[in-house]
């Protein structure tokens, strides 16, 4: 709106970034219907239009599915610590739970705020959707469980289901039962249809921090502050196996969600352990760092990729098929993803966006990088700069996008080429930095093939 004699003020329209997967899915369907082979993505910006949905890259091209690009920052007007986030089953919205007991909904494409409601009287610590997407279960710091419909109509309250703070919830593969764990040292199995407690799993000697139900079998895993991992038979309530070897609190235990062949365990002894269930829980790999890992999420499409959040606010992505013989096993690291400890990570059901929450009271969205994206490493998540770029990144201003020149998209200055944490090439090839000295050699989508 232009200035006029009536004193009106000129307003500038800013561009809001939107991440929409409709067009790539339509193109992928067309390619498959007519048996057209997918184009190989080359390190050139013109190949951006050829990027397909994550489901198309299950082979060696899975590197394209790693979310390396900061997309948006969201936060409530009244900010609280965010202990849990989860995507709605169709992936259109992100549900955010806070220490104030509120649920807030954020759009999963344009990342704008949609609604907020008071869900619990105390801090909401855990929540999970059923596999069918028909129900949402949440738990709070008082040990109360609430069951919600997808429209957030509350249908049942299990008051004081636990005597201490709830730590984790997991549905069975059939959605007929669910398991909960708490700081009261026990796990409980509940009948979902009537809300009745069926079994109490006792065996841990301290707070139970995590639990998960196998996606295809009648098997429950739990991790506790007593440094033990236990496997349970939900039919009998008996402990069938105990895994030793951890030196500190077990923070997270998570089965691989698609096949369930792998188990990831995060511990406060600064390690991540991967166990292979097909080989009698043999320890497949151990990843150690000098910083505590706090949260973990498996990629919903690629079975070997998972992401972890660190105590110092960093986010690291791992690929079990990647050569981890070097001193930095992560295939990609975002060193300044958050300003404080990362409390929760959640992949979109499609796998193209990763949402992260932290004790800095913000939610941040991460998408896949475009080929040779000059902003992929030139933003505050890598260089820790709080001026200009940080402001534009938060507001999604059009100035945050690097302008085009007569030679194409402007590249970072030569003194900014080493921003971030350089990693080796995931596909084992040489970085394209050998051909263009202005591109960071970081072994990432569009930067190293």
Swiss-Prot record:
What's a BP term from Gene Ontology annotated to this protein?
A: co-transcriptional mRNA 3'-end processing, cleavage and polyadenylation pathway
Q: Where is this region: Disordered?
A: 411-432
Is Nucleus found in the keyword set? yes
What UniProt keywords are attached to this protein's entry?
Chromosome partition, mRNA processing, Nucleus, Repeat, WD repeat
- Which CDD domains does the UniProt record give? WD40
Top-rank taxon: Eukaryota
SMART domains, per database record: WD40
Please report the residue spans annotated as repeat (WD).
Answer: 77-116, 119-158, 161-200, 203-242, 245-285, 288-328, 337-376
Question: Single GO cellular component annotation?
Answer: mRNA cleavage and polyadenylation specificity factor complex
Reported function? Required for 3'-end cleavage and polyadenylation of pre-mRNAs. Also involved in chromosome segregation where it has a role in chromosome attachment to the mitotic spindle.
Q: What is this protein called?
A: Polyadenylation factor subunit 2
- In its UniProt entry, the species of origin is given as Eremothecium gossypii (strain ATCC 10895 / CBS 109.51 / FGSC 9923 / NRRL Y-1056)
């Amino acid at each position: 709106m232009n200035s006029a004699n009536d004193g009106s003020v000129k307003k500038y329209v800013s561009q809001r970034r939107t991440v929409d997967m409709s067009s790539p899915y339509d193109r992928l369907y067309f390619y498959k219907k007519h048996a057209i082979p997918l184009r190989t993505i080359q390190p050139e910006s013109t190949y951006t239009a050829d990027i397909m949905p994550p489901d198309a890259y299950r082979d060696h091209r899975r590197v394209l599915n790693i979310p390396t690009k900061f997309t948006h920052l969201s936060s409530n007007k009244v900010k609280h610590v965010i202990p849990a986030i989860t995507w709605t089953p169709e992936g259109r919205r992100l549900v955010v739970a806070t220490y104030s007991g509120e649920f807030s909904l954020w759009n999963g494409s344009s990342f704008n705020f949609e609604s907020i409601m008071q869900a619990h009287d105390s801090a909401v610590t855990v929540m999970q959707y059923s596999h069918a997407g028909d129900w949402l279960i949440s738990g709070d710091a008082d040990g109360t469980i609430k069951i919600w419909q997808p429209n957030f109509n509350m249908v049942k309250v299990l008051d004081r289901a636990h005597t201490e703070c709830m730590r984790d919830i997991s549905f069975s593969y059939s959605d007929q039962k669910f398991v909960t764990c708490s700081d009261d040292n026990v796990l409980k199995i509940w009948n979902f249809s009537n809300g009745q407690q069926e079994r109490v799993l006792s065996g841990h000697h301290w707070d139970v921090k995590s639990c998960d139900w196998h996606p295809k079998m009648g098997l429950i895993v739990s991790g506790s502050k007593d440094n033990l991992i236990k496997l349970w038979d939900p039919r009998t309530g008996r402990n069938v196996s105990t895994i030793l070897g951890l030196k500190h609190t077990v923070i997270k235990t998570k089965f691989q969600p698609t096949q369930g062949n792998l188990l990831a365990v995060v511990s406060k002894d600064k390690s991540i352990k991967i166990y292979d269930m097909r080989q009698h829980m043999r320890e497949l790999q151990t990843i150690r760092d000098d910083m505590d890992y706090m949260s973990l999420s498996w990629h919903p499409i690629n079975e070997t990729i998972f992401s972890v959040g660190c105590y110092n606010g960093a986010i690291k992505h791992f690929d079990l098929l990647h050569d981890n013989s070097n001193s930095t096993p992560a295939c990609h690291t975002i060193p300044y993803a958050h300003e404080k400890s990362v409390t929760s990570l959640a992949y979109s059901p499609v796998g193209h966006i990763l949402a992260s929450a932290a004790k800095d009271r913000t939610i941040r969205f991460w998408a896949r990088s475009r080929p040779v994206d000059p902003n992929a490493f030139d933003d505050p998540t890598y260089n820790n700069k709080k001026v200009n770029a940080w402001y534009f990144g938060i507001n999604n201003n059009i100035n945050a996008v690097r302008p085009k020149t007569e030679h194409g998209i402007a590249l970072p200055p030569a003194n900014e080429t080493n921003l971030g944490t350089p990693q080796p090439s995931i596909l084992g090839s040489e970085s394209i930095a050998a051909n263009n000295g202005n591109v960071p050699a970081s072994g990432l989508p569009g930067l190293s093939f």
